[in-house]
């Protein structure tokens, strides 16, 4: 989602609260619980979950391994749920031509650096760079080139579904900032 007035443009960045993250967190949680309960059922020699039979599983070594996988999956699921709750990675890119400032704000993990806020001068922006790698793990990222700084990514890798969307976004931003586009 973008918000643009005459001299201010704000691009909102979606963080961890995406449907795919919710799906993976649920799948991981239920899968890990299934593994753990089957492993624990093999220890008790009693089915804790009616549709998951543990009669054929010996506690040593299969039951222990399943409990271990279940606990590991629960930790990973907990991590995913925490990133979703904290909305890590969300924020905005703000371009204020009146003040001449480009600001990046992102939410991070809790702690001293929870809020990430960086500012640059708009006059130092050289261009908008597009990086496109097609293939099995395609990658489409917009970068902003600033004098004396490494390229700064403006978008997530999976944000753009088509090359056309990415080109349109880059063209809008380049037009607003009156800079050139590099890449492709």
Swiss-Prot record:
It is a multi-pass membrane protein. The keyword Metal-binding does not apply. InterPro entries: PSI_Ycf4_assembly. NCBIfam families: PRK02542.1. Belongs to the Ycf4 family. This is Photosystem I assembly protein Ycf4. It is found in: Plastid, Chloroplast thylakoid membrane. One of its GO terms (cellular component) is chloroplast thylakoid membrane. Keywords: Chloroplast, Membrane, Photosynthesis, Plastid, Thylakoid, Transmembrane, Transmembrane helix. Its main location: plastid. One of its GO terms (biological process) is photosynthesis. Seems to be required for the assembly of the photosystem I complex. The keyword Plastid applies. The chain crosses the membrane at residues 21-43, 58-80. It comes from Marchantia polymorpha.
